[in-house]
Amino acid sequence: QYYLLNYYVDHEQWAEAVKVGRNAYKRYPDNYYIGLKYAMALCESGQYMASLNCLKKLQVLPYEGSYIGRDIYRRACLYQAMKEWEDGRYAKMLTMIEKTQEWPENLGVGKPDEELIDTRLEDYMAAIAYVEQGQSMQADKLFSQIASSNMSEAYFDSNNLLVVLALRNLGKVDMADSLVNEWKVKHVHNEIAQWCILVYNNEKKKATEILNKYEETEEIAPWNVGYRDYNFKFLSCQ
């Protein structure tokens, strides 16, 4: 069952992975490898709270590369927050965003130093929730934090989109426009950068075309093995 579960997960056949994972997890509840695969399948099939409940029961042994449990946990929290957003439940949205700041010890990885944690996506989503609730001071505080964050010179990160959107929300449109115009010159061949430019300019149809093209050809270049844009999938869902 473990090998079959792996097959379905590797091929992103999430409905089948959930079925096999459920049976395998019932049979081997102490096997956290199976538990993590099952939790991932639940998350990717839209069963976010079920995924979090599964993760809560696991006891993952710390080992090098054991970040997967924490990654699934964060994804499930963020996707559930997005669902609450779509349904207009902003208080619940904020609750789920707050949960992303937790690092459950049972998932096998400790919390890094604060300066190593990028929370711009979480902060932006929280700011949007505050805007919807009419709490402009709290929203502007978060927008300001995002707008003043550093953008990497080594690679283009989709979080850069959050920086210019935050600037625009703060009324600093000229500054945001200037940064986007720089991207047009510096990142002509970067599909994520081009997608961010189109989203910023509200060119939804072209942005979707770029996204589809990116998803068809997505791979990490050999010289970028140490970097993956983990937030792009979340941003492209919104």
Task: Give a label for each model feature.
Residues 3-12, 190-198:
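Alpha-helical segment of the N-proximal tetratricopeptide repeat
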Residues 177-238:
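Terminal, low-structured helical/coil segments at or just beyond the last alpha-helical repeat
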Residues 118-175:
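Repeat-solenoid scaffold signature
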Residues 6, 40, 82, 128, ...:
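Residue-level recognition of tetratricopeptide repeat
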Residues 2, 33, 67-71, 75, ...:
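Start-of-helix register in tetratricopeptide repeats
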Residues 27, 60-71, 103-116, 148-154, ...:
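Flexible helix-coil transition and linker loops at the boundaries of alpha-helical arrays
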Residues 15-25, 49-62, 89-102, 136-147, ...:
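Alpha-helical repeat scaffolds
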